[in-house]
Amino acid sequence: METERTEAKKRAFRVGEKFTTTIEKVAHGGHFIARHEGAVFFIRHGIPGETVIVEVTSTGKSFNRGDVVEVIGPSADRVKAPCNYAHRLGCGGCDFQHISISRQRDLKSEVITEQFARIAKMDLKVAVEEVAEPLHWRTRAILNIDGSGKAGFFGSRSHNSIQIDDCLTCVPVLKLAEITSRTWQPNTKLEISANNSGDRIIANAAVIEGPKELVEVVGANTFQVSHSSFWQSHKLAPAVLTEAVMQFAELQSGDQALDLYGGVGLFTAAALSAVGATGRVDLVEASSSAISDAKVNFGNVPNVNIYLGD
C-alpha cells in the first residue's frame, strides 16, 4: 500500500494533458472532485456520476485542476446552459448553468452540509430553498476593462478578460448590453449597482454616472448604500436573509444584539424593531464606506451604536 502511494505521488501531470474519469461529488467553489491514477482533481463543468474527458488546467502537490472537455456519459440533470459564456473558455462565473435547477439546489445543500461537518463538526442537514427565477437576479457587477476599452468578465482563475455582450444573471436595469457596447478607459474596472426602484450607479474609482448613493428598501426600512459599501447582490436576498436571521435570533423586547460585519445595517434595522426602545443594537463593521452609510441610516437612533473595526 505504501509503495502504491509513493508511486502515485511521483506521477506528474502536464497542463493540457487529457484523461477519462468519473466525477465523484461536488466541492466548494463550483468544482467537482474526480481522481485519476491516485491524484485528486478539482473539475469544472461536470456533474457527479458523469463519465467525462478532462483536460488538465493546473497542477499542484496535493491536488490538480481540470475542465471537462467532453461528456461521454451525461447525467440526466445536464441541460443546455442559457448563457453563451457559461463554458470552459467563457467567463469565470455561473459554474452550475449546465445543471438542472433542482439539482443545483441539491448540490449546494451538499456543499453546505459538508462544510458544517468538516469544519464545525456538526451533523446539520441544510436545504437550499427556491427564492426566485434563476436568471436576472444580480443587482451588482464588477467588469474588467481591457486594453481596448471593452468591458468583460475575467475567465476562471485568470486575469484574461472575456468580452461579453450581456449577462443573463444581472437585473435588466443594470443594462449590461449598453455597458458592453461602450468604450471605457482601458485597463480599469467598472462597478455597477442598481436598486429595486430602477436607479443605477456606474463607478470607475469614483461615481461617473447616476446618483452617488442608492436607496434600498427592505420591508419598512430604508437604507442608503454607497457604491463601495457591501449590499447583497441577489435582489431578493436582503428580505429573505433578514427573515431567516430574525427567526433564528428570537430577539425579545429589551434584548441587546450585536451585529458583526454589519455593513450598512440591514440586520441592525430588523433587530432594532425586535428589541424596541428598551433594547440596544451594536453594529461593528470594517468598511469606512459602510460605516458612513450606517451612520446616515441610524444617525438619530439613540439605542444603536456604530463602531468601525474588525
PLM regions and their residue ranges:
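Accessory RNA-recognition modules of RNA-modification enzymes
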Residues: 2-310
